Amino acid sequence: MTGYTMLRNGGVGNGGQTCMLRWSNRIRLTWLSFTLFIILVFFPLIAHYYLTTLDEADEAGKRIFGPRAGSELCEVKHVLDLCRIRESVSEELLQLEAKRQELNSEIAKLNLKIEACKKSIENAKQDLLQLKNVISQTEHSYKELMAQNQPKLSLPIRLLPEKDDAGLPPPKVTRGCRLHNCFDYSRCPLTSGFPVYVYDSDQFAFGSYLDPLVKQAFQATVRANVYVTENAAIACLYVVLVGEMQEPTVLRPADLEKQLFSLPHWRTDGHNHVIINLSRKSDTQNLLYNVSTGRHVAQSTFYAAQYRAGFDLVVSPLVHAMSEPNFMEIPPQVPVKRKYLFTFQGEKIESLRSSLQEARSFEEEMEGDPPADYDDRIIATLKAVQDSKLDQVLVEFTCKNQPKPSLPTEWALCGEREDRLELLKLSTFALIITPGDPHLLISSGCATRLFEALEVGAVPVVLGEQVQLPYHDMLQWNEAALVVPKPRVTEVHFLLRSLSDSDLLAMRRQGRFLWETYFSTADSIFNTVLAMIRTRIQIPAAPIREEVAAEIPHRSGKAAGTDPNMADNGDLDLGPVETEPPYASPKYLRNFTLTVTDCYRGWNSAPGPFHLFPHTPFDPVLPSEAKFLGSGTGFRPIGGGAGGSGKEFQAALGGNVQREQFTVVMLTYEREEVLMNSLERLNGLPYLNKVVVVWNSPKLPSEDLLWPDIGVPIMVVRTEKNSLNNRFLPWNEIETEAILSIDDDAHLRHDEIMFGFRVWREARDRIVGFPGRYHAWDIPHQSWLYNSNYSCELSMVLTGAAFFHKYYAYLYSYVMPQAIRDMVDEYINCEDIAMNFLVSHITRKPPIKVTSRWTFRCPGCPQALSHDDSHFHERHKCINFFVKVYGYMPLLYTQFRVDSVLFKTRLPHDKTKCFKFI
């Protein structure tokens, strides 16, 4: 019962709990439903209300983000007042901002005015400084002019001799003839120009006996000679050709003497006559041996009893009469060592009597001791050297065929000329054994051997010190040949082996120069004969001709603009502005010193003694103190001699030579716009004398083309043909020594040009410029290549932007082999390479590169020829052809470039640099 009751109670209790749970669940569900109803009904209404209120607030300029309390609604009016205040402040801020911007604009304008004023002040200071420099320079020039005590020299004015002269009979003994007693100086004033009258051999009996080739070659060279005149009355010198005679004709000395005495201008004594006997064969007769005239004799064979030192002339034989050597047939000078160390071919003529010997008097035969005959010792020694096999030599003392006719005791030539030349091309040295007769000073056979050795680059070794080599009065034969006494024949082998390659090549190169200049053609022989006599009587050479410029009329007046690419050189000017007219370099200051004091250098270095130049880059330089102690005319030392940094440096040229200017030579071809831009860039360039524009186009400039006014004359020169050689013609309008050759599309800053000019003044004999190139060895093909890649070595400076001396323009146009200029015209290329070859050949120095420029870029310029691939192939060919013409590679390498002295040097605040960017 109790258990039942408990169960029941428990059941009743559990049921109550269940009912309570159900009731609470219903309440929760009802509350949740009510809550959801409230949210779903009232929230959209509230949101709609506030959204509509927000729109109204926005329209009133208010932003309402939610419901406000009752107290806040009272403050709406205050908020509106604050908003109005904010709007007012914003308007004031906008007005203040506008005023601030106006003030900033005014400040910027004022700053610009300040900068302009500062710039104008600086310009005024620069102008003042330049004016002070000009005043100083003018005062200096005035003082120099007032203190000048030496007349200004120029091209000599010709003073001609009178028609009649008193005559000058020779001394009783014709062997005593010398210039002082057998030459009439009154007919040859120093400024006479050395007029020469040449007899026409066809008008005289002896002319019919002359060798036709000799006569024809002689007449051709006479027609082209600048000294020859047809007016015998004003002549200083009279020339008559008497040989070589045709075989077998032999004119007796008495007959020839009689014919010479009957010459129309002989004037009873024949003073100032030169009798020329040119040789073509080794057995040429000594036609003038017993002809007693007492006058100059020029021939290739002389006996001691006949030759008068300082009066007669030993000349080269006339081997061939071509106008210019065929450079393709001449072997190269390198390699230095050839197959044979030395060679000799010849056969001794044993006969001691001949028609020539019989003509000698008995007293002459008996004079002195009998000659020592070294020929047997020479033969034995040379054969021993050949048999020793120490060096490969070739000596033959018997001709395979009949030897050439020769004089007694002389070594006759063997074989034909072509065969002898082929052997000499394989020979490092060529032995020349002088005749055994000590009275025979020189013979045609020896002179022919010398000619052939020099022609092919075999260094002559002359055994016999008594020999008188051609033109020995002026030529320093020790630079091109070895003259060894015959008693030293046993030491010849040792002597030849001891020569270094550099010495040997220097002798070979000098021998080539002597052969080309004095031996190779009929022109060179005749010019040398006249030059020898002219030098002896101290008359200067004829002035070298200048190219007369045909000016193209053009309109100028266009104001030159300023180039934004021009570098500012800081507070330094680049030189004084020249207010006086452009001044030319002085000319012909050394008319007579070149002939008197410097004649040996002129005779033994290119181009020889045949021209008088207005100036050369080799003129002597005064010591530094001379400019302050009486020889200061024309000098402008820096700081008056005290030196200085940038400002003092830019105020004067300084250096080791007098003040000077330079001429710009600009080659152009149908690029008018590019040309005008380039000319404008030259505006205001200090020390610029003139601009010569070489108009290379057949079309004239446009008639409406207005040329810029750059402060100096612009001369537009018309050329006869389109040739790159025109760039280097020595135009008469170029009045300065310094030439800046520049392409019409080259961009150079003023400071770069001025620095290049200053460097050139210290290296006047070299090319000084900007773009560098070099020659590279092509190993597979064993030839040369033109290379424009960046390199630490260079050997050329392109003349599209380079300084050089006008002297080289003369050499390029009138002295350099014509074959080189012809190739330049053929390819329309390589003229810059040719100029580098020429200068290095003359000086044996490389060019000088200035600044870091390697090339030039011309944006907007028409395509240049240098961009074509064939351009480089042609330049390869040019280099190798030029090497053949010169016989060797004259270009030399250099491994440095030049910058200004104080470049990248830390300076005190009171010092300035020479150039800002260089």
UniProtKB/Swiss-Prot annotation:
Keywords: Cell membrane, Disulfide bond, Endoplasmic reticulum, Glycoprotein, Glycosyltransferase, Golgi apparatus, Manganese, Membrane, Metal-binding, Nucleus, Phosphoprotein, Receptor, Signal-anchor, Transferase, Transmembrane, Transmembrane helix. The active site is at 832. It catalyses: 3-O-(beta-D-GlcA-(1->3)-beta-D-Gal-(1->3)-beta-D-Gal-(1->4)-beta-D-Xyl)-L-seryl-[protein] + UDP-N-acetyl-alpha-D-glucosamine = 3-O-(alpha-D-GlcNAc-(1->4)-beta-D-GlcA-(1->3)-beta-D-Gal-(1->3)-beta-D-Gal-(1->4)-beta-D-Xyl)-L-seryl-[protein] + UDP + H(+). Pathway: Glycan metabolism; heparan sulfate biosynthesis. The record marks 277 as: Not glycosylated. Gene3D superfamilies: Spore Coat Polysaccharide Biosynthesis Protein SpsA, Chain A. Glycans are attached at residues 290, 591, 789. Disulfide bonds join 177-182, 188-236, 399-414, 830-878. It is an enzyme of class 2 (transferase). Residues 1-30 are cytoplasmic. One of its GO terms (cellular component) is plasma membrane. Its EC number is 2.4.1.223. GO terms for molecular function: glucuronyl-galactosyl-proteoglycan 4-alpha-N-acetylglucosaminyltransferase activity; glycosyltransferase activity; metal ion binding; protein-hormone receptor activity. It comes from the Eukaryota. The chain crosses the membrane at residues 31-51. It is a single-pass type II membrane protein. Expressed in pancreatic islet beta-cells. Expressed in lung epithelial cells. Expressed in microglia. Residues 1-140 are annotated as: Required for interaction with REG3A. The N-terminal glycosyltransferase domain (GT47) does not bind UDP and is therefore unlikely to possess glycosyltransferase activity. Belongs to the glycosyltransferase 47 family. Glycosyltransferase which regulates the biosynthesis of heparan sulfate (HS). Initiates HS synthesis by transferring the first N-acetyl-alpha-D-glucosamine (alpha-GlcNAc) residue (GlcNAcT-I activity) to the tetrasaccharide linker (GlcA-Gal-Gal-Xyl-)Ser core linker. May also transfer alpha-GlcNAc residues during HS elongation (GlcNAcT-II activity). Lacks glucuronyl transferase II (GlcAT-II) activity. Important for both skeletal development and hematopoiesis, through the formation of HS proteoglycans (HSPGs). Receptor for REG3A, REG3B and REG3G, induces the activation of downstream signaling pathways such as PI3K-AKT or RAS-RAF-MEK-ERK signaling pathway. Required for the function of REG3A in regulating keratinocyte proliferation and differentiation. Required for the inhibition of skin inflammation mediated by REG3A through the activation of PI3K-AKT-STAT3 pathway. Required for the function of REG3A and REG3G in glucose tolerance in pancreas. Homodimer; disulfide-linked. Interacts with REG3A. This is Exostosin-like 3.
